Amino acid sequence: MASSRLWFSLLLAAALAGRATALWPWPQNIQTSDQRYVLYPNNFQFQYDVSSAAQPGCSVLDEAFQRYRDLLFGSGSWPRPYLTGKRHTLEKNVLVVSVVTPGCNQLPTLESVENYTLTINDDQCLLLSETVWGALRGLETFSQLVWKSAEGTFFINKTEIEDFPRFPHRGLLLDTSRHYLPLSSILDTLDVMAYNKLNVFHWHLVDDPSFPYESFTFPELMRKGSYNPVTHIYTAQDVKEVIEYARLRGIRVLAEFDTPGHTLSWGPGIPGLLTPCYSGSEPSGTFGPVNPSLNNTYEFMSTFFLEVSSVFPDFYLHLGGDEVDFTCWKSNPDIQDFMRKKGFGEDFKQLESFYIQTLLDIVSSYGKGYVVWQEVFDNKVKIRPDTIIQVWREDIPVNYMKELELVTKAGFRALLSAPWYLNRISYGPDWKDFYVVEPLAFEGTPEQKALVIGGEACMWGEYVDNTNLVPRLWPRAGAVAERLWSNKLTSDLTFAYERLSHFRCELLRRGVQAQPLNVGFCEQEFEQT
């Protein structure tokens, strides 16, 4: 209790220091004071330390320096200091950045180190990090520390920060099948993810309604499965752009191709892939999940996932495995015959497991790891020990905290999404419901809790497209972002509300149409451009 009171006292003291400490997400350790330094936009620059492993030419940081300079001051020129009245003697016109290990051309991974320290005092203005990914997180924090007075002068307060994420996987899922999202919308989302220190873009590319992914091996999938094969697709170049744009912001791209269910859009492009449904003894003309009884199915999956494994460089692929409806399989006489030959009886979970086990073997043969939805675990599919289980069901078959207990007790790593479905909306400040979730509040040993590697906010697309995506995402997704980054003791709702309200105004200033948290105003309101 004493440590909790001390932590809250530190939070309260920091809050009283003013706008300079309205950070989101809140750092692990911070000391700040009222002493402030002026920044002159025309003079300010980011600079590599002479001993830094990263130097000019580092794509990740070179672009980040320009990006954050524009975010802080805009791209125009500012009045010269002598035109602004009194010249301030305490100035900070250089942020020195030092990175310990090289890696400017690499991709972020689950194991990437994102720690950083930020020191702003009379002697130095220094950002120190182990990796370029930590430097990116520190640059975002630095950008939020800078504030502008009513007279238009930029300041930053004396501050010391030691920061690191609580969880290594802090994700956001976008569904681009139920409604197509333009490429620009995805890129904009990646920007705001970086502002929130989220680091995994879970791209739910395809589903029953549409197949917008352009496969170079099976182009008919897109041609016959997308809403429009000209306007509503993601080309190979689009995918490359998303991956690189994300990389430059320290964000992994986790691509999901969900099977055997959620695959109706695959059928038109690959005849024979889906299971024909029967009405009595005759085909009904409708189709169900992928047909797991045919060798052709696995030949197709081998070729398709070989392509996917080469297109998406992250070590992990998301293979879905959720919500498989057995009705069509049960109606099909060929499926029934296959099950008899395999000795499955009438247990269709065994049939599902047979398909998924075969698919997992295919994907692992390409040197990939995989993430699956919780049904794969619930249905007792034999999976590799390094499989990551994503928990998404709130109460079925058990409460999601019980599910986390069971998954980790079995020795598997887990991701939590169940309480963080942002597409579900309600009147009032529902961000609080997301914020108060404690991912480790289940019965289990310390070893079990160490297997929870993070979580994801999910934005499913039944009722969300480009017209309402941004205000529904932000700042609500920020509540999940802080829960996954900050210390467990950073949990006071009043303190969170004050900072998130300020951050929402900062998002408006940055051109993000983030919805309000309650009654109030921002100095710079959002204007449609």
Curated annotation (Swiss-Prot):
GO terms for biological process: carbohydrate metabolic process; ganglioside catabolic process; glycosaminoglycan metabolic process. GO terms for molecular function: beta-N-acetylhexosaminidase activity. Glycans are attached at residues 115, 157, 295. Pfam families: Glyco_hydro_20, Glycohydro_20b2. Residues 423-424 are annotated as: Critical for hydrolysis GM2 gangliosides. The active site is at 323 (proton donor). GO terms for cellular component: lysosome; membrane. Addition of GM2A stimulates the hydrolysis of sulfated glycosphingolipid SM2 and the ganglioside GM2. It comes from the Eukaryota. Disulfide bonds join 58-104, 277-328, 505-522. Residues 23-88 form a propeptide. It is an enzyme of class 3 (hydrolase). It is found in: Lysosome. Keywords: Disulfide bond, Glycoprotein, Glycosidase, Hydrolase, Lipid metabolism, Lysosome, Signal, Zymogen. It catalyses: Hydrolysis of terminal non-reducing N-acetyl-D-hexosamine residues in N-acetyl-beta-D-hexosaminides; N-acetyl-beta-D-galactosaminyl-(1->4)-beta-D-3-sulfogalactosyl-(1->4)-beta-D-glucosyl-(1<->1')-ceramide + H2O = a beta-D-3-sulfogalactosyl-(1->4)-beta-D-glucosyl-(1<->1')-ceramide + N-acetyl-beta-D-galactosamine; a ganglioside GM2 (d18:1(4E)) + H2O = a ganglioside GM3 (d18:1(4E)) + N-acetyl-beta-D-galactosamine; a ganglioside GM2 + H2O = a ganglioside GM3 + N-acetyl-beta-D-galactosamine. Its EC number is 3.2.1.52. Hydrolyzes the non-reducing end N-acetyl-D-hexosamine and/or sulfated N-acetyl-D-hexosamine of glycoconjugates, such as the oligosaccharide moieties from proteins and neutral glycolipids, or from certain mucopolysaccharides. The isozyme S is as active as the isozyme A on the anionic bis-sulfated glycans, the chondroitin-6-sulfate trisaccharide (C6S-3), and the dermatan sulfate pentasaccharide, and the sulfated glycosphingolipid SM2. The isozyme B does not hydrolyze each of these substrates, however hydrolyzes efficiently neutral oligosaccharide. There are 3 beta-hexosaminidase isozymes: isozyme A (hexosaminidase A) is a heterodimer composed of one subunit alpha and one subunit beta (chain A and B); isozyme B (hexosaminidase B) is a homodimer of two beta subunits (two chains A and B); isozyme S (hexosaminidase S) is a homodimer of two alpha subunits. The composition of the dimer (isozyme A versus isozyme S) has a significant effect on the substrate specificity of the alpha subunit active site. Belongs to the glycosyl hydrolase 20 family. This is Beta-hexosaminidase subunit alpha. It comes from Pongo abelii. The gene is HEXA.
